[in-house]
Amino acid sequence: MIRVRAVVYPGASFPEYQTLGSSGADLRAFLPGGPLEVHPLGRVLVPTGVCVELPVGLEMQIRPRSGLALEYGVTVLNSPGTIDADYRGEIRVLLVNLGLAAFVVSHGDRIAQAVISSVLRVEYVRSGSISLTERGKGGYGSTGVL
């Protein structure tokens, strides 16, 4: 098992897996000063009170929690958010409310999940052309919508 060093502010919650098979560890809101209200179509940057030291070659992806999306229309706006191995600041989660009613985020609420992933770096090489494929330049919807 890979160990990731974490600094957790007093009163904040350590990232935690809910089940043995969970791929994402829940991140909780760190709001000791009181709750935040997210209006419909509004967005808010929610602190977690957690800083991590990821080994080079790993990243942390900040992903939505399915229950928040289903029940309230609340999701992570820049999903997945990326925490790079050289970032040492507090993890903050950009939530957006796509629902019809205001949503309140309170201290300790589970707001996102953190998934650790390997990073493969490549060298981009300038070229005058790239190989042709059957798909070609077909983009959004080119292979069918449903």
Curated annotation (Swiss-Prot):
Gene3D superfamilies documented for this protein: 2.70.40.10
Keywords for this protein: Hydrolase, Magnesium, Metal-binding, Nucleotide metabolism
Cofactor dependence: Mg(2+)
Signal peptide bounds: none
Pathway(s) where this gene product acts: Pyrimidine metabolism; dUMP biosynthesis; dUMP from dCTP (dUTP route): step 2/2
GO molecular function: dUTP diphosphatase activity; magnesium ion binding
UniProt keyword Magnesium present: yes
Bilayer-crossing regions: none
GO biological process: dUMP biosynthetic process; dUTP catabolic process
Domain of life: Bacteria
Catalytic function, reaction form: dUTP + H2O = dUMP + diphosphate + H(+)
Purpose: This enzyme is involved in nucleotide metabolism: it produces dUMP, the immediate precursor of thymidine nucleotides and it decreases the intracellular concentration of dUTP so that uracil cannot be incorporated into DNA.
PANTHER family for this protein: DEOXYURIDINE 5'-TRIPHOSPHATE NUCLEOTIDOHYDROLASE
Protein family: Belongs to the dUTPase family.
The protein, known as: Deoxyuridine 5'-triphosphate nucleotidohydrolase
Organism encoding this protein: Treponema pallidum (strain Nichols)
Organism ancestry: Bacteria, Pseudomonadati, Spirochaetota, Spirochaetia, Spirochaetales
